[in-house]
């Protein structure tokens, strides 16, 4: 007996990240190879023709799991009964634009989308914000959806997590799949703190294996933090395929579980690790039965505290920068 289809809403559906994302969702990479999906695609009125072109390609793949597609410029149509909402679309920073202007432009988008989710989405909707500034956009959406549980709102730090995994594998010579217990703390921005103090590869401590404080401080942390900029520099375009891959990883693990393995998600703080409540902050989590659970009780040394507080300061500044826009 086929499972009932799940509704997956994707915003920014005509964009580059969505182009790398939609075919994989339709192929079963997001929710499982036995789970039919209905894609509900949102983009601006002027992008509707482009979205139709993408849907023609989706049709031409004849995906067995794709049970339907909705194309719209109305958030209330896109989010209707959505089980998963991938908020990919955001206002990009244009030349000469101040960060506060970027925050305001996105606050407008994410208050509207949060309110629409509040009104029409499934009460168990799993929301992942990919569009930057992702943590603060997720915070705005969460605050605009008072009737939905706060825990439903997450921000994507999985790209940073995957970038850090790849750097650690290259440095240690260990297979990337063998690395466990990596954490990335804070904001999805260059201030984030990738932390491998607890990490192991094939049961060995990575800290002992690598044993190079200077590399951690001067190479590893900045490389992970500035990787997005390095890709733009090299490619002339932002990292779309790797971002889409990270979004798939994030939601798949949230829905299907991590078997006790740590992954990083930006989630609303409960006050632990000295992070004020409700701030959407990257922390290590495990996932089981469709729920994430933060890894608790990790020791925070002086260097880590400084890094964690630095990225928190940026998040607090962003929160305060949009406070007047939230009712």
From Swiss-Prot:
Active-site feature positions: 188 (proton acceptor)
EC number(s) stated in the UniProt entry for this protein: 1.1.1.37
Record key words, sorted: NAD, Oxidoreductase, Tricarboxylic acid cycle
InterPro entries assigned: L-lactate/malate_DH (IPR001557), Lactate/malate_DH_C (IPR022383), Lactate/malate_DH_N (IPR001236), Lactate_DH/Glyco_Ohase_4_C (IPR015955), Malate_DH_type2 (IPR010945), NAD(P)-bd_dom_sf (IPR036291)
MF term (GO), any: L-malate dehydrogenase (NAD+) activity
Residues reported in the UniProt entry to bind substrate: 93, 99, 132, 163
Catalytic activity: (S)-malate + NAD(+) = oxaloacetate + NADH + H(+)
Enzyme class: oxidoreductase
GO BP, sorted A to Z: malate metabolic process; tricarboxylic acid cycle
List of residues binding NAD(+): 12-18, 106, 113, 130-132
Keyword Oxidoreductase annotated: yes
Main function: Catalyzes the reversible oxidation of malate to oxaloacetate.
Family membership: Belongs to the LDH/MDH superfamily. MDH type 2 family.
NCBIfam families, per the entry: MalateDH-SF1 (TIGR01759), PRK05442.1 (NF003916)
Protein name (record): Malate dehydrogenase 1
Annotated source species: Burkholderia thailandensis (strain ATCC 700388 / DSM 13276 / CCUG 48851 / CIP 106301 / E264)
Gene it is expressed from: mdh1
């Amino acid at each position: 007996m086929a499972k009932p289809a799940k509704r997956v809403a994707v915003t920014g559906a005509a964009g580059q990240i969505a182009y790398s994302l939609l075919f994989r969702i339709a192929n079963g990479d997001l929710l499982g190879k036995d789970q039919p999906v209905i894609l509900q695609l949102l983009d601006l009125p002027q992008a509707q023709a482009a979205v139709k072109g993408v849907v023609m390609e989706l049709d031409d793949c004849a995906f067995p799991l794709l049970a339907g597609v909705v194309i719209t410029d109305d958030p209330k149509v896109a989010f209707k009964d959505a089980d998963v909402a991938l908020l990919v679309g955001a206002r990009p920073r244009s030349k000469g634009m101040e960060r506060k202007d970027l925050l305001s432009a996105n606050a407008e988008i994410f208050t509207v989308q949060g309110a629409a989710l509040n009104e029409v989405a499934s009460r168990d909707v799993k929301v992942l914000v990919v569009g930057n500034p992702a943590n603060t956009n997720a915070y705005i959406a969460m605050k605009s959806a008072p009737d939905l549980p706060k825990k439903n709102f997450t921000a994507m730090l999985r790209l940073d997590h995957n970038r850090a995994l790849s750097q650690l594998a290259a440095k240690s010579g260990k297979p990337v799949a063998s690395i466990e217990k990596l954490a990335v703390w804070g904001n999805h921005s260059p201030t984030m703190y990738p932390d491998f103090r607890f990490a192991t590869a094939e049961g060995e401590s990575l800290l002992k294996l690598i044993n190079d404080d200077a590399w951690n401080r001067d190479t590893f942390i900045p490389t992970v933090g500035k990787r997005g900029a390095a890709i733009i520099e090299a490619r002339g375009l932002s990292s779309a395929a790797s971002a889409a891959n990270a979004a798939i990883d994030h939601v798949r693990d949230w829905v299907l579980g991590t078997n006790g393995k740590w992954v990083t998600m930006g989630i609303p703080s409960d006050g632990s690790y000295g992070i004020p409540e409700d701030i959407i902050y990257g922390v290590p989590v495990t996932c089981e039965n469709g729920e994430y659970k933060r890894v608790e009780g990790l020791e925070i040394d002086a260097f880590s505290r400084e890094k964690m507080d630095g990225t928190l300061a940026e998040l607090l500044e962003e929160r305060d920068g949009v406070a007047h826009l939230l009712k």
